[in-house]
UniProtKB/Swiss-Prot annotation:
One of its GO terms (molecular function) is DNA-binding transcription factor activity, RNA polymerase II-specific. The gene is opdl. Residues 15-45 bind DNA. CDD domains: fungal_TF_MHR (cd12148). PANTHER family: FINGER DOMAIN PROTEIN, PUTATIVE-RELATED, MISCELLANEOUS ZN(II)2CYS6 TRANSCRIPTION FACTOR (EUROFUNG)-RELATED. It comes from the Eukaryota. This is Transcription factor opdL. Transcription factor; part of the gene cluster that mediates the biosynthesis of oxopyrrolidines, polyketide-amino acid hybrid compounds with feature structures of tetramic acid.
Length: 566
């Protein structure tokens, strides 16, 4: 009876044998020795290895919210009703700004506020004159730009830096930041799009280190245009921006990044994206440009009447010329232009229609922009694209064509006009040249080399040399590029030298290649070993297509392909 009055041990204190059998553990003999069950079964009564931990009781959600509210009320009471504190929206924007400008942490101390203001002034007054892809009012300060467009400011800093080592560091950080925001955080903003456009226009070709990134960053810009909806009319409200799957509730948390009111900044961005991707597509030959839409035509018409920025009308003319070039390049006569295959010539009615469009563009240029160099460069390049169809490899049974001969001389005339204008730019001005003009220089050099080596009845190659000697032009470009660094005060530090000096060395290498292949150049002495030693292992990224002339089959054939387009 005594054993039946004993109570079992409390939960968690049973011996290991009873705990394993999930039985009550009743002690015997005052708690000493074996328990009742182990005694009857003649088993070893082992003490438990460790007591089971009891999880603390969690507070209910209502209690947690009450404690948070009590903490907020006590915090507000301690500030005594101050009104000078930032609002939650202001605080959020400040935190975003701190996160977005984290790339500045390593380089902010190196630049003074005066030099930063000079960067902004130079970018606004010099670079945007050649490619007005954005409008920065004169009243905008560096602080304003850092707060409103932090990624754009980082790109401007990299472009305008006169220290090659710091420029290289900024370029790498910009790529890292762009990858994080675009691919990791899936961020979509006008600031990102404008920064990517600046990257494409200047950083890829003028800054260090050179990387083959034109194609990938072009697709980034096109993707941002799609995500922001800039190629389509702005919806009247955000409820119309969701996809069908989101409309039925499959993705209820998805927020649209599309604005309901189209701004002038957005119109400039989408047109600039079209201009840049159109030129890059022609330059590389392995991608397509941003597709033209009716809404982009509306943006073009609005900018044509804009009085907000003088650059708007320049951008309008650049866009119109690229539209015509795209129309020319999509014609059947262009199929053999950059290859060794034969192709049909440009029909007369096609030529007259395209010539009429080009003359319309010329006639609609405002009087004050008649001598604008960026517009003239694009007009020359458009005219060259129109007449270069005469350089396609003739069909085997094709008779002599006086029209083809006229087009060849028209190409020669346009190339001469282009370089005559190009050499009016002072050495310091070449640093402001954007990607479109570098591509146009390469285009003219390709055409001039083909004109200098073309065999066609009635075509006089000595006239080409007397009109525009490609060796003299290459020498002049090389000399001027070598003067740019000193003209702008560029400091070459670290492993990266002056990018413009590399341009000059690259032109010297090209000149040596041309001198070997050009006829009647026996008087030109070419030392290939010295040319290669002066240009050791130049890594030019997408500019490798400038250098790899010896690998192009059309050079050996004397006609056919289009040199820089690879």
């Amino acid at each position: 009876m005594e054993s039946t009055m004993r109570s079992p041990l409390p939960y968690g204190n049973a011996c290991a044998t009873c705990a394993r059998a999930k039985c009550r553990c009743v002690p015997r003999n005052g708690g000493r020795g074996r328990c009742e069950r182990c005694h009857h079964l003649n088993k070893e009564c082992r003490a438990p290895q460790g007591r089971r931990k009891i999880q603390p009781k969690t507070l209910s959600r209502s209690v947690q919210l009450e404690r948070k509210m009590d903490g907020l009320m006590s915090l507000l009471t301690s500030f005594g009703g101050r009104t000078d504190l930032p609002t939650p929206v202001q605080r959020q924007s400040e935190v975003q700004g701190m996160w977005r400008t984290e790339v500045e942490s390593g380089t902010e101390d190196e630049e003074t506020s005066a030099s930063e203001e000079e960067y902004l002034r130079a970018f606004r007054t010099q670079r945007l004159q050649f490619l007005p892809l954005i409008h920065i009012p004169a009243t905008t300060t560096v602080g304003d730009l850092k707060l409103q467009s932090p990624f754009l400011w980082q790109c401007i800093s990299a472009v305008e830096s006169k220290n090659t080592a710091r420029q290289a560091t900024l370029c790498v950080k910009i790529r890292e930041l762009a990858g994080k925001r675009l691919l990791v955080d899936c961020d979509k903003s006008l600031d990102l799009l404008q920064g990517v456009l600046v990257y494409l226009a200047w950083i890829t070709l003028h800054s260090q280190p050179h990387k083959s990134s034109l194609c990938m960053y072009s697709q980034m810009a096109i993707g941002l245009v799609f995500e922001l909806g800039l190629n389509k009319p702005a919806p009247p409200d955000l409820s119309m921006t969701v996809s069908n799957s989101n409309a039925v509730g499959h993705m209820p948390g998805l927020e649209a990044s599309i604005s309901t009111r189209r701004t002038m900044h957005e119109r400039r961005a989408v047109l600039s994206c079209f201009v840049l991707t159109s030129i890059i597509a022609q330059f590389l030959g392995r991608m397509g440009p941003l597709q033209w839409t009716s809404h982009m035509k509306q943006c073009l018409d609005i900018l044509a009447e804009s009085e907000e920025s003088p650059g708007d009308r320049v951008l309008v003319q650049l866009t119109r010329t690229r539209l015509l070039v795209d129309q020319i390049s999509h014609g059947p006569w262009s199929e053999g232009l950059y290859g060794l295959n034969s192709a049909q010539t440009l029909a007369t009615f096609h030529l007259k229609a395209l010539q009429s469009q080009l003359e319309t563009i010329r006639a609609e240029i405002p009087i004050q922009l008649a001598d604008n160099k960026p517009i003239l460069f694009h007009l020359f390049d458009t005219e060259l694209s129109l007449y270069e169809a005469a350089l396609v490899k003739p069909l085997a049974d094709e008779d002599f064509s006086s029209q083809r001969l006229d087009h060849l001389y028209a190409c020669l005339r346009v190339v001469k006009q282009f370089f005559d204008l190009f050499f009016t730019i002072p050495p310091a001005g070449y640093t402001s040249l954007a990607l479109p003009y570098i591509a146009q220089v390469s285009h003219c050099l390709v055409i001039l080399f083909r004109l200098s080596t073309l065999d066609y009845p009635g075509w006089d190659k000595s006239t080409v040399k007397n009109t525009a000697d490609i060796l003299c032009i290459a020498e002049q470009i090389s000399t001027r590029m070598a003067q740019v660094g000193d003209a702008i005060g560029m400091r070459s530090e670290g492993a990266y030298g002056d990018p413009f000096s590399k341009w000059g060395m690259m032109m010297q290498k090209l000149r040596s290649e041309w001198a070997i292949r050009l006829p009647d150049c026996s008087e030109v002495v070419v030392d290939r070993s010295s040319a290669e030693s002066s240009c050791p292992s130049i890594e030019m990224g997408d500019l490798d297509c400038f250098v790899n002339w010896s690998e192009l089959g059309w050079v050996m054939e004397g006609a056919g392909a289009g040199g820089f387009i690879q």
